[in-house]
Amino acid sequence: MHYHQLAVSGERRLTASRDSTTYDLTSADADLRTFGDLARVASIARTSVDRLAAELTEDADVVDDAFVDRHATVPVDAEEIWAAGVTYQISEQAREEESSMPDMYFDVYDADRPEVFFKATPSRTVEPGDAIGVRGDSEWDVPEPELGIVLRRGEIVGYTVGNDVSSRSIEGENPLYLPQAKVYDRCCSIGPCVVTPEDVEDPHELEMSMTIERDGEVIYDDATNTSEMVRSCDELVSYFTRHNTVPELAVILTGTSLVPEQPFDLQEGDHVDITIEGIGTLSNSVTTV
């Protein structure tokens, strides 16, 4: 199923979509207002998220897609968002080109241990339709479309779409500047929904595309497939959870293979659409922070 978190008249609500019908699960159980609530109760009941949701749909109100789009927020209240780097060959090549120390990216691409780094807190993460940010002290910024792994207590409970906005100029000055290039206000967006593993036959065989518009014209449009990843989702989760007390809910962004080439620079007023097969489209405008 596809799960959306909504904010309606100041209240949280959770919906589930199946066979072109969307159900307001909160109307069936007022205690279930977030995806985390549903996953927690499913775990206690020793059932799957989808099975519990299916039972709730019998007593739930039906809502239309326009209602969901109008009120959608981030699809999961992740306490932490992490990201993986150099998981596609093209990202390794792009970071070599930008860096004063290119060999280190080639080494990570072929290493046993993946690059996994902290990306965002809830306050730095924007919802679908809101504006992602580019740093005012950066000269070269790019959106990075990525498959997001949704975790509950370190276990995969779903997938979403993520945008890992990055300053390539700051990271390119020195790899030690990576936290400043990656972590700042409005540096990340996830959405529009969480899709459970039961509805994703293979997360490593998903079409992914990104379109960027400026002043009403498309200035970037490209597509790829997650089959180009050199790391598996299970591998990234394994390294994330090793010797690490992980939060109740977290998201891992799995890296990108769609990298706009120079002289492209993400600017205030641009509009970014990222689509992943079977999940949906994450749309954001751009602002300067």
Swiss-Prot record:
Pfam families: FAA_hydrolase (PF01557). The keyword S-adenosyl-L-methionine does not apply. Keywords: Carbohydrate metabolism, Lyase, Magnesium, Metal-binding, Plasmid. GO terms for molecular function: lyase activity; metal ion binding. It catalyses: 2-dehydro-3-deoxy-D-arabinonate = 2,5-dioxopentanoate + H2O. Its EC number is 4.2.1.141. Pathway: Carbohydrate metabolism; D-xylose degradation. InterPro entries: FAH, Fumarylacetoacetase-like_C, Fumarylacetoacetase_C_sf. It is an enzyme of class 4 (lyase). Disruption phenotype: Impairs growth on D-xylose as sole energy and carbon substrate. Mg(2+) binds at E144, E146, D164. Induction: Transcriptionally up-regulated by both L-arabinose and D-xylose via the pentose-specific regulator XacR. GO terms for biological process: D-xylose catabolic process. Probable 2-keto-3-deoxyxylonate dehydratase involved in the degradation of D-xylose, a major component of hemicelluloses such as xylan. Catalyzes the fourth reaction in the xylose utilization pathway through dehydratation of 2-dehydro-3-deoxy-D-xylonate into alpha-ketoglutarate semialdehyde (2,5-dioxopentanoate). Belongs to the FAH family. This is Probable 2-keto-3-deoxyxylonate dehydratase. It comes from Haloferax volcanii (strain ATCC 29605 / DSM 3757 / JCM 8879 / NBRC 14742 / NCIMB 2012 / VKM B-1768 / DS2). The lineage of its organism: Archaea, Methanobacteriati, Methanobacteriota, Stenosarchaea group, Halobacteria.
